[in-house]
Amino acid sequence: KSFLEAVDPNLASKLIAPAQEATNKEIEETSGQSVGLHMTGGFYLASNKTWYDYLKRERSKARYMGLHQEFISPKEVAERHPLIDPKHYLAALWDDQDGDLDPSGATYAFAKSARVHGAQYFTHTPVTATTQKSDGSWDVTTPKGNINAEIIVNCGGLWAREVGHMQGINIPVQPMEHHYLLTEDIPEIAAAKDRLPCGIDYEANIYFRQERKGLLLGTYEQRGTPWKVGGTPWDFGHELLQPNLDQIADRLEFAFERIPALAETGIRQAINGPFTFGPDGNPMIGPVPGMTNYWCAVGVMAGFCQGGGVGLTMAEWMMDGEPSIDVWAMDVARFGNWASPDW
């Protein structure tokens, strides 16, 4: 299940987060399909002064945008999440609008809502070519026939680079391996009446949330592992990759220290899969410079936190000529031709 994170270092990403929350409610109502949302609240943990100061800045940004976040003490952290050892922390920033959702349910809800509003989508229909016509529109070639479109948007995900290459465009994104673990049942969770909050520890580079009667623990290692630098195979079917726990061993040491129950609990499954980053970690959205009617929305690594806001921003940009917020930190135009694979 997807984890919703509301703390982000740039204002543009912060501004689109509320749009995602509104989108979740809208697509449930329109589609009749649950997105499996658990609004547990979540906290962002500061273990030293550097991260405490960082969270103070983030809270200031949140207040500026009307988002409600508040600091709580380590004691309050332990009261809300008794598996956490509070002695490692100075403070935590609490967000009562955080939580997680079911990515499969959310995807179906988006698809059903789109169809209600007149959109069409075609599964198992690969795009093999994109050809611009003299009037500026595009022919999108598929094995089932051509689709003519006024505007095309590269939302290729792991295949964003390959879709761009169809038109001679270099999209500077790179898939990276990402690990997370699912634990066996933890007695304290099994006995709890309410679902536990989710959390992020910035120094440890870990995030965690309840999964059934255990925990999901994810890591962001400081030395990430690129995947398929030469290009994503067209026949890749989102298969999982071989886990490499040595790669995240130092992150796990932090986790076992700060959530002691993890050291005493079995690992039910270790999961490793690729997802895509831009060079600075932010999405790359908007019209591609030098092209007509060619847009992109790629590198959205925090998909279910940012996806609805990215979609709204793109729609405003296309329909009104500009988005309602300043998206400089996400504009694809911030990277020029110099952002090549060699770079």
Where are these regions (language model features)?
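Short Gly/Ser/Thr- and Asp/Glu-enriched loop/turn motifs at secondary-structure junctions
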Residues: 38-42, 176-177, 270
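Dinucleotide-binding Rossmann-like beta1-alpha1 core, especially the glycine-rich loop
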Residues: 1-80, 203-207, 212-216
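Flavin-dependent oxidoreductases
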Residues: 10, 129-241, 250-258, 337-343
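Short loop/edge segments at beta-strand edges and connector loops
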Residues: 39, 73, 123-125, 269
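Short beta-strand to alpha-helix junction loop
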Residues: 14-17, 45-54, 93-116, 122, ...
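C-terminal catalytic lobe of FAD-dependent flavoproteins
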Residues: 203, 212, 234-343
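Helical element adjacent to the flavin cofactor pocket in flavoenzyme catalytic cores
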Residues: 92-151, 159-162, 308
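Helix-loop-beta segment of a Rossmann-like dinucleotide-binding subdomain
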Residues: 33-44, 58, 78-117, 139, ...
